[in-house]
Amino acid sequence: MNKTVSDFTVKLIGNNTVTADLASMVLNQTSTITGDGSLHLTSKRFFGLDMESASVTIDNTSLFVKGGYGIAGYIGAKSEVLTVRNSYVEAEGSGSGSISLISDLILEDCAITQPVGAEFDADQKAVVLNGELLKSKVVIEPITNSIGTVTADVPARKQGIYNLNGVKLTLQWNDLPAGIYIVDGVKRVKN
């Protein structure tokens, strides 16, 4: 697809589907798949997403891949690195691995959630479960490790400073230790 264009970006708008007999998408240079939409790649016999000597970043989007190989590099070369950043990814490679033949899998603000216990094995250059190459569906999902936005319509009698357990505190803001509090219905962090 992009043999001569490095830093290639696929921006997803809406729901997109590519179905092919061979590879659904081939990326030969450093590439990013991003956007508010989603992408469904299905290969009837070969690669869903072929990272041929390329590093690929899946950034803040949703990607669904199925094929004989799900998401795969060509030979697991050092340049074939898959980065998943705050994205939802489903990959299934019924013949040769769901996520395979890559030198590294970098997960930023996300984790492999299905199957439980699955992990990237650098020696096998693939996502495995109990040391076995996975050919069934692998799911990578965004993780949250903090409080997002707290929205509340706080009546006057409920205003004040609360801890995360919902207990109203009697100390003033300046007297509180460092931590996360809800002040008049708004999340505040005190350092």
Predicted regions and their residues:
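C-terminal outer-membrane/trafficking sorting elements
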Residues: T144-N191
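A composition-driven surface/loop motif
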Residues: M1-T144
